[in-house]
Amino acid sequence: MSLKSILRDLKEVRDGLGGISKRSWSKSSHIAPDQTTPPLDNIPQSPWASLPPELLHDIIWRVEESETAWPARAAVVSCASVCKSWRGITMEIVRIPEQCGKLTFPISLKQPGPRDSPIQCFIKRNRATATYILYYGLMPSETENDKLLLAARRIRRATCTDFIISLSAKNFSRSSSTYVGKLRSGFLGTKFTIYDNQTASSTAQAQPNRRLHPKQAAPKLPTNSSTVGNITYELNVLRTRGPRRMHCAMDSIPLSSVIAEPSVVQGIEEEVSSSPSPKGETITTDKEIPDNSPSLRDQPLVLKNKSPRWHEQLQCWCLNFKGRVTVASVKNFQLVAEIDASLDAPPEEHERVILQFGKIGKDIFTMDYRYPLSAFQAFAICISSFDTKPACEG
């Protein structure tokens, strides 16, 4: 059987399961006849659920290797949607963005990007609806069939401005399952706080096999919003000419992530991930980091603007965006790690661009990020540039 026929059958299975799921979890906005729920034994199982593990592993591995770009990569997500055994093997094969440089599942948006090369995305701004959409890819395609990653909506309040970040461009409710976090600015628009929404799944884990009646609403899982970063734009009191200057203190990312050797950091992350802990608590490890300062793990990573150079002929400040930015704008920036000279870090770490953002057209901007930032963190930093900052510009 060819790989295309397998993927076609998988799509049919996914659509069938999706129909059952939609009927079971539909809201009470429509009146349905009172019918007896069929027993679980009578529900038809997927014909692919009984495949030998070796064959199943080979099939999913082939799908993972062949479908590397969206929208074709949706086939990998379909494999994880068939049944529990398929989902388990798919999660074993699909590597995290840090290792493969690809975004597959929604959880990938909150995982660090690759170390070697950045993940390239672009942002579309809609002034009429005050929304900002993050897409996966170099630039907008002609078919406009780009993969949507995240969406944000600006909500102005009396003393602050909120940017609600969601997985959907149509639902920005903070009680929705698509809500992933928010960015909040102060009154002057110079200080921002990034909040990461975390769902406590202890209730779901305690009763994994519990099945709800179609008329019974699913229990709402409690959410825990934690601060993962703070962004500060420097005030330009003298109104001098020049680009905006900003600092981003990433509370959830230690400074050791960019100074220690990758093998050491990976070992620490594996040790932390293998240790169970309650949601919201921080796990500490006694593994030593080979740096001059043993407290690097306690210091948050701080990002700062990469210093631009003044171009005499163009009469503007310039940065080397390597062709990813084509329009001069006060919003354009490149962020590098702020590393003290006493830490004896490699010279390339001082110049390594972790996040860059810039304009390429009307209401279109590129966003390229890499380790240790995630797509969610990078997107939150970039949309902070859209807020009005009269006190920061010359």
Swiss-Prot record:
- GO cellular component entries: cytosol; nucleus; plasma membrane; plastid
Biased region (Polar residues) positions are 26-44
- Domain F-box: start-end pairs: 46-101
Query: What tissues contain this protein?
Result: Ubiquitous.
* Positions of transmembrane segments: none
Picking any one GO molecular function of the record gives: transcription cis-regulatory region binding
Q: Which GO terms describe its biological process?
A: regulation of DNA-templated transcription; response to fungus
* Region of interest called Disordered, as start-end residue ranges on this chain: 21-44, 200-225, 268-297
* Family the entry assigns: Belongs to the TUB family.
Q: What is this protein called?
A: Tubby-like F-box protein 2
- Source species, please? Arabidopsis thaliana (Mouse-ear cress)
